[in-house]
C-alpha cells in the first residue's frame, strides 16, 4: 500500500495576508520575512512513491560551521526530519543519475566517492540578504512571491540540477525585459557586435569618470544575459583560446587545478550567481519573474586546462608586477582547502584571479565570462564587507577588493568601471581593518623569540602579506590616479609599514628554506618604510653606485613624486597667470611660485632615473616602471585634461585667415595652458621613449592598462604636432573654404576640381622655406642619444616616428600619424581578434578622434 502524501495549500500567514504562497515547507514568503511557517494541507491526499515526514522549519534554525553537510552532485533522496536541507519535489527516484547527465554536456565532475565539502553557514546568507533590497513602497502583507529569495529547497536542488534540462527563461526575461529588447548578439568581424563597439566606453575618452552621467542598469542586465548565454551553451568550452595563447611565454608559476577544486569552484560560482540574481530581482521591481528552479542557469566553468591558462595569464599581467603570490597562494588547490580560509572568500579570490586572466584574453567569449564573474564577485564581496564574517581574514578581503578594482577599472565595460570608481574609496578602507604599521624589527626579534619555527614563519608571512597588500594598493591607486587624472587616496606620511622583503624569502616553500634565508636577508637588507625611504631620497642620501635599490623600492618612490606633480597641477588650475590687485607682492602662493615648485619636482625626476638605469634588469616590471616615470615627467610639463578637452572639441568651424607675414591659423583655436612653451621638444622626447618601451613589452606581459598609455601618448603627440605644424593639420573642409575666401577677395576664380591647396603661397609651410632639417627619430633610440639631446637643447631636427618596416612618419602627416597610433593599440602586426575589450575601446576612441578631425583612414584588419 503506497503511503499518502498531503497536498499543501497556502500557509496560515499567507492566507491571513491574502498573499500568494508557493506552497513549500517552509514557503519563500515566510523565510524572507523571518516567520515560522505553518503549512496547511488539503483534505484529499495524493499518492507518491516515497513519503517522509517534513517538520516545520524556523528561519533561524540553520546548521553552523561545525555541522557541515556533504552536498553530493549525484541524485539525493529526501532527508529525514533532523536535516535542514529539504529535497525538491521534482526529484524522482527513477530519474537518471545527475552526474551521467552532466557528463553528456561535456562538463567533467567528480564521482560519488569524491565529494565536494562545502560549509553550509554562508549558503544561508543568500536567504535573508534580499530583505535589504526590498522596495519601501511594498507593504509587508503584500504579495512578494515574485521577489522572494530562494529557500533551502532551491539551494539543495541547485547543486544537483541537471545541465541537460530546459533552463527556461534567460536573464533578460528574468529581470523583466522582453526578448525584443535584447540586442542582437551577431558578432562583427572582430567578434563583437556593432552596438557593443559603440556603447562600451564614452566616445573619445576610454572610461573617464568625468564623462559619466547616464544610467547603466540596462547595460548591466545585458552583460549578465550574455554571461548566462555563454555559460549555458551546450557545446563544450573550446580550447581555441588556450591554443591561441599557448605559444605565448606564460610562466608556469601556479600549480594546475584539480578536478576537485574545479567542482568546488562550480558549486561556489553557482551560489554566487543565485545570490546576484536574487539581488537584481529586488532592484528591478514587480515586473520581474519569480525566482524558481525553472529559470535558473546552471553555470558551466571552462575545463581545468583552460582555467590553468587563465591563471597563467593572471600571473603575467598582474602578479609579476605586485608579487602577491606566496608559496601557499601558488597552489590554487590549497586556496580552496586551506583551514584558515573562509570557503566563500577563498572562492571569490580564485574566481577573480581567473577573471583577470580572462580579461587579458582576446576571445570575446572570455570577456563576457570575465565581466559576469566580476559582477558576481562584487555582489558577494559587498555582503562579506557588510556582514563582517568573523572567520574571514581581512587580508583575504583586501586581496579580493584589490583584484576586483583592478579588473573593473581596466575591463572596458562602462557600467562596471562606473561602479568600481564609486566603490574605490570604500574598498580602500579595507586596509584600515588591520593596523598599517608595525615594528619593522619584529620579524627579526621573532627569530630569537619563544615561538617555534613554524609559528615564526606563519607570523612573518602574515605581516609580509599585509605589507605587500598595502604597497600593492598604493601602486594600483597611482595607476588609476595617473590614467584617470584623479587624486590619490594614499599619502607618503601614512606609509609607516615596512617595505616588502626579497622575493626569495617570500617564495620559500618550506619553513626550513625560510629559516636558512631569513638571517641573511634580515642582516643585509635594513627594514625601512616608504616614508623613510622617500626622506632619504629627498635628502640626496641615495646615490647611484653607492647602493642598488630593489626594483620594487624604485617603483614605490614614483608614488610620492607623482603625488607632488598632481598636487601642483591642481594648484596651477586655481591660480591665474595675471597678478591680482588685492594680493600683496610678497605673497608666496602665486602662479610663478607654483611653477617654481614644479621645476623643483622636475629636478628630482632625473635623480630617480639615474638610480633606475643602474639596475641590470630587462623584466616587464622594469619596462612598466620606466613608462610610469615618463608619464609623470609628461604630467610635470603638460596638462593632459586640457589637451584632451581641446582635441575632443574638434577643429573650429571658422578659422582666422593667415596674415601676410605667414603665420598659420591654429585649428585648435585659443585653449588653456597645456604645454609649456620651452618644454614641447622635451615632451616629444618623453612620448617617443614611451612608444619605444611599448614596442619592447611582450604582448603576453602587458598590464591591463597598457593601451590607456597609448591613448594618452597619442593625444599628447597629436596636440604637439598640431601646434608645430598647424597648417598641415587643418581639415580639408577648412582649407577649401579658406582658399575660396582668399581667391574671391583677390578677384580670381578657382575651379573646384582643380584647386591645388599647396600651390597657394599663403599656405606654404614655414618649415619648407627654411633649410631642410635632418629627421630625429623619437621612438627608436635611447634617451641618451646625441640627436635627441641636440633636439631637446637646440631644437634642431624634424621629429619623426619610425614604423616597424623602417619607414619614417613626420608629424606634419596627419593621416599617417593617426594610423600609427590606431595600429599601435593592438600591436598593429596582430590580427584584429587579438585585441582585448579595453584595447578595442581605445582603438575605437582614436578612430572617432581621427574621424572628427577628418583624417580617418580605412585599415585592413
Swiss-Prot record:
CDD domains: fungal_TF_MHR (cd12148), GAL4 (cd00067). Pfam families: Fungal_trans, Zn_clus. Transcription factor that positively regulates the gene cluster that mediates the biosynthesis of oxopyrrolidines, polyketide-amino acid hybrid compounds with feature structures of tetramic acid. It comes from the Eukaryota. Disruption phenotype: Impairs the production of oxopyrrolidines A and B. It is found in: Nucleus. GO terms for biological process: DNA-templated transcription. Its main location: nucleus. Keywords: DNA-binding, Metal-binding, Nucleus, Transcription, Transcription regulation, Zinc. Transmembrane segments: none annotated. PANTHER family: TRANSCRIPTION FACTOR WITH C2H2 AND ZN(2)-CYS(6) DNA BINDING DOMAIN (EUROFUNG) (PTHR47660:SF2), TRANSCRIPTION FACTOR WITH C2H2 AND ZN(2)-CYS(6) DNA BINDING DOMAIN (EUROFUNG)-RELATED-RELATED (PTHR47660). GO terms for molecular function: DNA binding; DNA-binding transcription factor activity, RNA polymerase II-specific; zinc ion binding. This is Transcription factor opdJ. GO terms for cellular component: nucleus. Residues 11-37 bind DNA. InterPro entries: Transcription_factor_dom_fun (IPR007219), Zn2-C6_fun-type_DNA-bd_sf (IPR036864), Zn2Cys6_DnaBD (IPR001138).
Amino acid at each position: 500500500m503506497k503511503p499518502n502524501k498531503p497536498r499543501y495549500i497556502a500557509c496560515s500567514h499567507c492566507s491571513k495576508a491574502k498573499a500568494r504562497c508557493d506552497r513549500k515547507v517552509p514557503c519563500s514568503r515566510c523565510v524572507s520575512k523571518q516567520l515560522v511557517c505553518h503549512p496547511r494541507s488539503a483534505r484529499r491526499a495524493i499518492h507518491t512513491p516515497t513519503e517522509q515526514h517534513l517538520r516545520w522549519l524556523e528561519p533561524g534554525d540553520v546548521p553552523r560551521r561545525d555541522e557541515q553537510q556533504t552536498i553530493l552532485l549525484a541524485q539525493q533522496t529526501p532527508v529525514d526530519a533532523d536535516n535542514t536541507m529539504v529535497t525538491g519535489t521534482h526529484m524522482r527516484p527513477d530519474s537518471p543519475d545527475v552526474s551521467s547527465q552532466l557528463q553528456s554536456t561535456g562538463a567533467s565532475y567528480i564521482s560519488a566517492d569524491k565529494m565536494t565539502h562545502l560549509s553550509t553557514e554562508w549558503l544561508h546568507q543568500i536567504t535573508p540578504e534580499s530583505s535589504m533590497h526590498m522596495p519601501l513602497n511594498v507593504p509587508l502583507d503584500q504579495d512578494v512571491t515574485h521577489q522572494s529569495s530562494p529557500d533551502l529547497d532551491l539551494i539543495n536542488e541547485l547543486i544537483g540540477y541537471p545541465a541537460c534540462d530546459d533552463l527556461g527563461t534567460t536573464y533578460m526575461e528574468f529581470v523583466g525585459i522582453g526578448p525584443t529588447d535584447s540586442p542582437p548578439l551577431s558578432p562583427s568581424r572582430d567578434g563583437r557586435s556593432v552596438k557593443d563597439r559603440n556603447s562600451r566606453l564614452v566616445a573619445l575618452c576610454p572610461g573617464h569618470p568625468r564623462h559619466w552621467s547616464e544610467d547603466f542598469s540596462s547595460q548591466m542586465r545585458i552583460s549578465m544575459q550574455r554571461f548566462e548565454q555563454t555559460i549555458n551553451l551546450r557545446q563544450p568550452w573550446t580550447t581555441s583560446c588556450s591554443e591561441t595563447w599557448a605559444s605565448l611565454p606564460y610562466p608556469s608559476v601556479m600549480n594546475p587545478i584539480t578536478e576537485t577544486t574545479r567542482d568546488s569552484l562550480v558549486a561556489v560560482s553557482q551560489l554566487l550567481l543565485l545570490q546576484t540574481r536574487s539581488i537584481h530581482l529586488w532592484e528591478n521591481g514587480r515586473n520581474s519573474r519569480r525566482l524558481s528552479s525553472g529559470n535558473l542557469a546552471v553555470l558551466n566553468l571552462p575545463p581545468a586546462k583552460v582555467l590553468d591558462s587563465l591563471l597563467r595569464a593572471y600571473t603575467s599581467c598582474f602578479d609579476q608586477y605586485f608579487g602577491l603570490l606566496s608559496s601557499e597562494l601558488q597552489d590554487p588547490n590549497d586556496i580552496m582547502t586551506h583551514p584558515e580560509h573562509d570557503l566563500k572568500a577563498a572562492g571569490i579570490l580564485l574566481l577573480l584571479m581567473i577573471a583577470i586572466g580572462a580579461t587579458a584574453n582576446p576571445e570575446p567569449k572570455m570577456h563576457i565570462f570575465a565581466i559576469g564573474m566580476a559582477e558576481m564577485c562584487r555582489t558577494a564581496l559587498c555582503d562579506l564587507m557588510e556582514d563582517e564574517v568573523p572567520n574571514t581574514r581581512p587580508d583575504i578581503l583586501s586581496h579580493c577588493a584589490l583584484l576586483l578594482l583592478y579588473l573593473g577599472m581596466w575591463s572596458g565595460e562602462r557600467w562596471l568601471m562606473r561602479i568600481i570608481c564609486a566603490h574605490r574609496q570604500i574598498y580602500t578602507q579595507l586596509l584600515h581593518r588591520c593596523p598599517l604599521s608595525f615594528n619593522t624589527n619584529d620579524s627579526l626579534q621573532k627569530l630569537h623569540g619563544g615561538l617555534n619555527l613554524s609559528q615564526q614563519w606563519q607570523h612573518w608571512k602574515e605581516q609580509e602579506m599585509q605589507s605587500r597588500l598595502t604597497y600593492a594598493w598604493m601602486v594600483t591607486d597611482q595607476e588609476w590616479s595617473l590614467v584617470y587624472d584623479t587624486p590619490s587616496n594614499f599619502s607618503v606620511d601614512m606609509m609607516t609599514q615596512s617595505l616588502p622583503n626579497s622575493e626569495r624569502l617570500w617564495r620559500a616553500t618550506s619553513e626550513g628554506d625560510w629559516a636558512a634565508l631569513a638571517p641573511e636577508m634580515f642582516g643585509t637588507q635594513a627594514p625601512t618604510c616608504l616614508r623613510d625611504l622617500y626622506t632619504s631620497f629627498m635628502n640626496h642620501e641615495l646615490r647611484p653606485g653607492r647602493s642598488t635599490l630593489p626594483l620594487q623600492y624604485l617603483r614605490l618612490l614614483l608614488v610620492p613624486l607623482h603625488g607632488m606633480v598632481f598636487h601642483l597641477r591642481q594648484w596651477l588650475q586655481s591660480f591665474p597667470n595675471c597678478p591680482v590687485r588685492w594680493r600683496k607682492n610678497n605673497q608666496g602662493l602665486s602662479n610663478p611660485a607654483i611653477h617654481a615648485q614644479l621645476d623643483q619636482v622636475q629636478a628630482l625626476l632625473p635623480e630617480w632615473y639615474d638610480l633606475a638605469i643602474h639596475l641590470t634588469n630587462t623584466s616587464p616590471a622594469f619596462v612598466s616602471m620606466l613608462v610610469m616615470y615618463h608619464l609623470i615627467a609628461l604630467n610635470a610639463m603638460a596638462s593632459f585634461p586640457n589637451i584632451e578637452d581641446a582635441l575632443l572639441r574638434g577643429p573650429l568651424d571658422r578659422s582666422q585667415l593667415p596674415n601676410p607675414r605667414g603665420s598659420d591659423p591654429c585649428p585648435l583655436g585659443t585653449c588653456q595652458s597645456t604645454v609649456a612653451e620651452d618644454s614641447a621638444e622635451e615632451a616629444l622626447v618623453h612620448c617617443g621613449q614611451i612608444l619605444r618601451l611599448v614596442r619592447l613589452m611582450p604582448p603576453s606581459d602587458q598590464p591591463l592598462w597598457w593601451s590607456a598609455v597609448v591613448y594618452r601618448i597619442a593625444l599628447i603627440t597629436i596636440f604637439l604636432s598640431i601646434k608645430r605644424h598647424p597648417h598641415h593639420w587643418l581639415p580639408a573642409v577648412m582649407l577649401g573654404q579658406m582658399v575660396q575666401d582668399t581667391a574671391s577677395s583677390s578677384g580670381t576664380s578657382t575651379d573646384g576640381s582643380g584647386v591645388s591647396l599647396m600651390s597657394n603661397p599663403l599656405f606654404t609651410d614655414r618649415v619648407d622655406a627654411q633649410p631642410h632639417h635632418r629627421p630625429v627619430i623619437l621612438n627608436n633610440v635611447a634617451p641618451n642619444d646625441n640627436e635627441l639631446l641636440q633636439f631637446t637643447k637646440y631644437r634642431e631636427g624634424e621629429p619623426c616616428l619610425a614604423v616597424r618596416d623602417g619607414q619614417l612618419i613626420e608629424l606634419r602627416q596627419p593621416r599617417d600619424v593617426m594610423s600609427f597610433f590606431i595600429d599601435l593599440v593592438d600591436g598593429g602586426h596582430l590580427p584584429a581578434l587579438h585585441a582585448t575589450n579595453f584595447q578595442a575601446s581605445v582603438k575605437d576612441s582614436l578612430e572617432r578622434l581621427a574621424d572628427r578631425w577628418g583624417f580617418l583612414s580605412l585599415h585592413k584588419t
